[in-house]
Amino acid sequence: AIPDLTYEQFIQTYQKYYHPSNAFVFLDGDVPLDDVLELLNQEYLSSMEANLPIEGPIYQQPVQVSRQVVDYEIGEEENAENKYRMAWGNVIGSYQDYEKVIAMQVLSDVLCGDNQAVLNKVLLEKGLAENVYLAINDGELQNWCQLEVDHIKEENLDQVKEIVFDTLQTLIKKGIDRQQLEATLAYLELNLKERNFGGYPQGIIFGFQVLESWLYGGKPEAHLEYGKIFDDLKKNP
């Protein structure tokens, strides 16, 4: 644990893991590739020996579903009456399931994207919650999602859970409006193709996307190539 970490342990950890053996190098832009690679090799990589064994990824095995109650802090002046939250999480595949990640991002927008989205609308109209969102956590060995509903009163917790699961079951049985799915899919595709990263350098974002697969043994370019994924999803949204 950090409070018990000694300086010697810190140095040992640094020397073991902050090493080219545990590094991923990527280049971005129109650079003289041969010259840059030669420079990296001569000035940096060739003088060091590999000292870190390559370990395969460790997957989280399925666990028994459990209910956990956790306290969290609020401000002294805040009213705790409607500060309850409910959340459900689930693994949705591995780093290789990029098509599933994009499909889940579409589903997140359909379910919780705005106040007229399916789950938002039913809970807001009944005054049972203030926020509903479905977070998709990708770029990891195992991607996962979390559906969260917040600003709930304690006496409404069971009702909120019932409405959430009933609504999802109805969608499973009746399906989601195809036009809505296609519109959301088109919007997401446009955003990705425009490569608008909100002011962040494009090369840095590309590097992060490369690592989302490369870190776990996948192809570096896997999460940069999504044209076919959208084509497949359009055929069967």
Model-derived regions: residue spans:
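Edge strands and adjacent loops of beta-rich recognition modules
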Residues: 71-78
